[in-house]
Amino acid sequence: MARLTHFDGDGQAHMVDVSGKAVTDRIAVADCYIKMTTQTLDLVEQGTAKKGDVLGVARLAGIMGAKKCADLIPLCHPLPITKVAVDLVPDASLPGVRITATVKTSGQTGVEMEALTAASTAALTVYDMLKAAEKTMEIGGLRVVLKDGGKSGRFEAPEGSAP
């Protein structure tokens, strides 16, 4: 098993020193979904939810979530994010919305946590905007599907591992 780098020799949590690492282009993609009834999904697709444009607001919330990651996750480094894209796609087969967040930087550490935070923040926002219509929505499947750049190289989630 790999050594956990967020603990010092005494077992105390600390922020990893990345100052000796090379600056490289990095990307991470995370996805998740939010399941809901077909009636609630209709509100999203027809733009008739009481709180307004569910997908547009959730997209902005996801972008903001990526930018605030270091404020939320104690040992994350504040990073110079160069791109955040959050895609929300209604999917009648769930039924619900599939969410994909892509984050890029040129830096000394990866952006996996920023991508995960963007996707989860977008999903939470969808829930918030629709909870008056349905309280049984389910958020799930949050995972990194792509990570590239840095010393550890490229990771891609196996095909067919998504719900």
Curated annotation (Swiss-Prot):
Catalytic center residues:
D128
Query: What pathway is it annotated to?
Result: Cofactor biosynthesis; molybdopterin biosynthesis
InterPro entries per the UniProt record, alphabetical: MoaC, MoaC_bact/euk, MoaC_sf, MoCo_biosynth_MoaA/MoaC, Mopterin_CF_biosynth-C_dom
What GO terms describe the biological role, i.e. biological process, of this protein? Mo-molybdopterin cofactor biosynthetic process
Family annotation (SUPFAM superfamilies): Molybdenum cofactor biosynthesis protein C, MoaC
What's the Enzyme Commission number for this chain?
A: 4.6.1.17
Q: Give a single Pfam family match.
A: MoaC
Q: List UniProt keywords, sorted A-Z.
A: Lyase, Molybdenum cofactor biosynthesis
The chemistry this enzyme catalyses reads: (8S)-3',8-cyclo-7,8-dihydroguanosine 5'-triphosphate = cyclic pyranopterin phosphate + diphosphate
Where, by residue number, does substrate bind?
Answer: L75, C76, H77, M113, E114
Top-level EC class = lyase
Q: Name one GO molecular function term.
A: cyclic pyranopterin monophosphate synthase activity
Q: Which residues form the signal peptide?
A: none
Q: How does it assemble?
A: Homohexamer; trimer of dimers.
Q: Which HAMAP family match?
A: MoaC_B
Q: Which family does it belong to?
A: Belongs to the MoaC family.
Q: Quote the function comment for this protein.
A: Catalyzes the conversion of (8S)-3',8-cyclo-7,8-dihydroguanosine 5'-triphosphate to cyclic pyranopterin monophosphate (cPMP).
> PANTHER family from the entry?
CYCLIC PYRANOPTERIN MONOPHOSPHATE SYNTHASE (PTHR22960:SF29), MOLYBDOPTERIN COFACTOR SYNTHESIS PROTEIN A (PTHR22960)
Q: What is this protein called?
A: Cyclic pyranopterin monophosphate synthase
Taxonomically, what lineage is the organism?
Bacteria, Pseudomonadati, Pseudomonadota, Alphaproteobacteria, Rhodobacterales
